[in-house]
A protein has these predicted regions:
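N-lobe entry segment of adenylate-forming
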Residues: 1-57, 61-74, 167, 189-196, ...
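AMP-binding/adenylate-forming catalytic domain of the ANL superfamily
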Residues: 162-163, 530-553
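AMP-binding/adenylate-forming catalytic core of the ANL superfamily
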Residues: 121-125, 132-134, 408, 425-534, ...
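Gly/Ser/Thr-rich phosphate-binding loop
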Residues: 175-180, 291-293, 303-395
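Structural core segment of the AMP-binding/adenylate-forming
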Residues: 106-176, 284-289, 293-313
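Conserved AMP-binding/adenylate-forming core of the ANL superfamily
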Residues: 15-19, 39-91, 95-99, 119-121, ...
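Conserved AMP-binding/adenylation subdomain of ANL enzymes
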Residues: 226-242, 250-291
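Conserved pre-ATP/AMP-binding loop-to-beta segment of ANL
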Residues: 35-38, 162, 167-168, 179-227, ...
Length: 568
């Protein structure tokens, strides 16, 4: 499936940012040239996490598994452009499935492992998925059971595959197929079909622009490779290195920056299922991790735990920040051999990264072209502040800024077509093709001589709640909580936690029967089978939901009310 316009393909292909290779073709060359080098290593605790025995695969064993699974899927009738939902933790299996999708022209749709049945069904229906691959469980989350329940209600789902022990009945065990690489015929092992080209969609991730509901965004091989190459030209990731991947496949950081980029350069991938920083550091020491990605807020604690030999082996440390830097405290020290790279995630629509020069610059982004370090004539991305000139013209304005708009080699121009549609809905854009993000920004420095103009994101312009690395539209959560029969009105809000720690999701309820409302409300949420991420940590009872004259919830007042009630 092609979503890129002919103009985009011509522009980025002629510049050299896009090429003709699919991801599987790139990896196959590594497998031919370095067959016995290690490619994929699972977390040694994977079995307790997902029920799957940890794998340790060379390049040739990985490729043989890819070919074996392709032959199996083709044999049961799987065709190009089939959307396959994937609920699998960071693991060798996730990498193999990605290469299989690339080789067959299948479109992967990684979905969060914590998705409730209602959220899962909504995503499957949006993209018209015909098959699902899942793990048997993830920690305490009954992933396979939820998948089976949803698939049983959807006639459009043809296949449900499971990887791992103790899978519920009715699911096809994919583990034996994945482990059956010895059955592959050596003749034709490196024959490559023409199922898809490099501009075909490889994967779907969900992204939202402020007040808009999250929409599926399909990206081609070229767009995903561009993300990985843009980030890692700053890390110097190479085939001799070990890349630690602990972010999940449902986000661009885990999928594109982690898996796709390492498969592209032929680096060894050490997968890790993050539980504690101490365990993470121990794994770094044991497996020799050289390139790591961590939330920016964890850097100070992680820095203090790193033993000397780990500090010396590290080459790059990517610190991930959300799109709002205004209240972040940045730990400035780095007593390691690694370069620090600060990465700003714009709602999984786009990523921006830069090598750290000074902690005060974290979050400051150049206005205009984001050029390649290796070839300044190449432009990975362009930034534009919509409404900045109007803001500058206001004499009484203390802040000059506007809405962040983006375009570039890693950005699509439309959403993935909803089930039954032929074309995807165009993303909101300016006349010059810059995609609106609904992220408010302010200008930090004006352009002066060689000094680039810099701006800093302030946060969402829409009513969006951020907590624990997740974001949800406030009005969606309000409607969910308000639909409980015991509740006459409701609103969600987030109570800040400690410094640099994620906030806690809370709910304010207006009820008549406070004595029974709590039990009834949580029973209602259980019956709705929603994601655990949408469950409030606690609730408060209020006489009325504070609103502005336009009906918008005054969530700051609810935070104050929770502090008075000593609930937060």
């Amino acid at each position: 499936m092609l979503l890129s316009t002919p103009e985009q393909i011509e522009t980025y292909s002629s510049s050299g940012l896009w090429g003709e290779d699919r991801l599987d073709l790139v990896f196959a060359r590594h497998a031919e040239q370095r067959p016995d080098d290690l490619a994929l290593i699972d977390d040694q605790g994977l079995h307790s996490v997902s029920g799957r025995r940890p794998q340790c695969l060379s390049f040739i064993r990985t490729w043989r598994r890819v070919v074996a699974l392709c032959e199996f899927l083709a044999g049961i009738g799987m065709k190009a452009d089939t959307v396959v939902a994937m609920l699998v933790p960071p693991s060798a299996d996730a990498a193999v499935l990605t290469l299989v999708a690339s080789r067959m022209g299948i479109i992967l749709a990684p979905i969060p492992l914590t998705s409730g049945e209602a959220d899962l069904r909504e995503k499957l229906e949006q993209v018209g998925a015909k098959a699902i691959v899942c793990c048997s469980h993830y920690e305490d989350e009954a992933v396979a059971e939820r998948v089976r329940n949803v698939a049983a209600e959807m006639f459009s789902i043809r296949f449900v595959f499971c990887i791992g022990e103790n899978a519920p009945e009715g699911l096809i065990d994919l583990g034996d197929i994945l482990d059956g690489e010895d059955n592959v015929d050596e003749d034709g092992l490196f024959d490559h079909g023409g199922q898809a080209n490099s501009n075909s969609v490889l994967a779907i991730h969900w992204s939202s622009a402020g007040s808009e509901q999250a929409r599926p965004i399909g990206r081609s091989h070229n767009q995903l490779l561009a993300i990985g190459r843009y980030i890692h030209e700053q890390t110097d990731l190479s085939a001799e290195h070990c890349s630690f991947v602990n972010h999940h496949m449902s986000g661009l950081i885990g999928f594109a920056v982690g898996v796709v980029a390492a498969l592209d350069v032929g680096a060894r991938i050490q997968f890790h299922n993050f539980r504690t920083l101490g365990r993470y550091v121990d794994a770094l020491a044991e497996f020799g991790g050289q390139h790591v990605v961590l939330p920016g807020g964890l850097w100070q604690e992680a820095h203090g735990l790193l033993p000397m030999h780990v500090r010396e082996q590290l080459i790059s440390i990517i610190l991930v920040w959300n799109r709002e830097h205004a209240e972040q405290t940045v730990f400035g020290e780095n007593e390691t051999a690694a370069r620090l790279i600060d990465l700003t995630n714009f709602k999984d629509l786009a990523l921006f990264s830069q090598i750290r020069r000074h902690p005060s610059e974290v979050g400051s982004i150049p206005l205009g072209s984001i050029n390649s370090l290796r070839d300044p004539s190449l432009v990975w991305m362009e930034t534009f502040l919509y409404g900045m000139e109007e803001s500058r013209a206001q004499k009484d304005s203390s802040i000059v800024g506007g809405e962040l708009c983006l375009k570039g080699a890693m950005l699509p121009h439309c959403a993935f077509p909803l089930a039954g549609a032929v074309e995807g809905k165009a993303l909101s854009a300016t006349e010059d093709g810059f995609i609106h993000t609904e992220i408010g920004c302010h200008l930090v420095t004006e352009e002066h001589g060689d000094q680039r103009a810099l701006f800093r994101p302030l946060g969402d312009l829409g009513d969006v709640l951020a907590f624990g690395g997740f974001t949800e539209r406030g009005e969606d959560l309000d409607a969910l909580y308000r639909a409980c029969i015991m509740v006459s009105d409701a609103a969600a809000f987030v109570v800040p936690s400690g410094e640099n720690s994620p906030g806690h999701l809370m709910a304010a309820l207006v009820v008549d029967d406070k004595e029974n409302a709590r039990e009834e409300f949580f029973a209602y949420l259980r019956d709705k089978r929603i994601s655990s991420m949408k469950w409030p940590r606690d609730i408060i009872f209020v006489e009325a939901i504070p609103r502005q004259t336009n009906g918008k919830v005054m969530r700051e007042s609810l935070i104050e009310a929770s502090q008075v009630a000593d609930v937060a």
